Amino acid sequence: MMIWKRHLTLAELNATSQNTMVAHLGIVYTRLGDDVLEAEMPVDSRTHQPFGLLHGGASAALAETLGSMAGFLLTRDGQCVVGTELNATHHRPVSQGKVRGVCQPLHLGRQSQSWEIVVFDEQGRRCCTCRLGTAVIG
């Protein structure tokens, strides 16, 4: 069963990223399912740390991007969602290619939400697990 209250296409979701950090990092929404939102991000000079690996902050940015947009899709007119807490556990390095973030709800309350975002490499291996808490305002 679809949980989203706002009904946007992937093209509309991606258009919201124009001229933002999301676009600068190359993050692209790729799937909007009944209760899941996915995006891809390149692992290249924009997202590397100085030693040629995916920067943990880039993984966190992907996670917060997904969780915040998922939270927004659950709001009604006059409401917004803001992040309150982000936790990231890094499991394995990635040096090139793309990573895919998969965002699903853990808790959906009237005033707060919790999201799990798992980042996978191109071989489908879990690279990072994040949890984002959000507050619903309005």
Swiss-Prot record:
Keyword Nucleus set for record: no
Organism: Citrobacter rodentium (strain ICC168)
Subcellular location: Cytoplasm
Record key words, sorted: Cytoplasm, Hydrolase
Pfam families the record matches: 4HBT (PF03061)
Keyword Hydrolase (UniProt): yes
CDD domains the record matches: PaaI_thioesterase (cd03443)
Regions crossing the membrane: none
InterPro entries xref list: HotDog_dom_sf, PAAI_dom, Thioesterase_EntH, Thioestr_dom
SUPFAM superfamilies xrefs: Thioesterase/thiol ester dehydrase-isomerase
Quaternary state and interactors: Homotetramer. Dimer of dimers. Interacts specifically with the aryl carrier protein (ArCP) domain of EntB.
Primary site of residence: cytoplasm
One of the protein's GO biological processes: enterobactin biosynthetic process
Top-level EC class as recorded in UniProt: hydrolase
EC number from the UniProt entry: 3.1.2.-
Cited function: Required for optimal enterobactin synthesis. Acts as a proofreading enzyme that prevents EntB misacylation by hydrolyzing the thioester bound existing between EntB and wrongly charged molecules.
Pathway where this protein functions: Siderophore biosynthesis; enterobactin biosynthesis
Name of protein: Proofreading thioesterase EntH
Family: Belongs to the thioesterase PaaI family.
Active site (record annotation): 64
Gene Ontology CC terms: cytosol
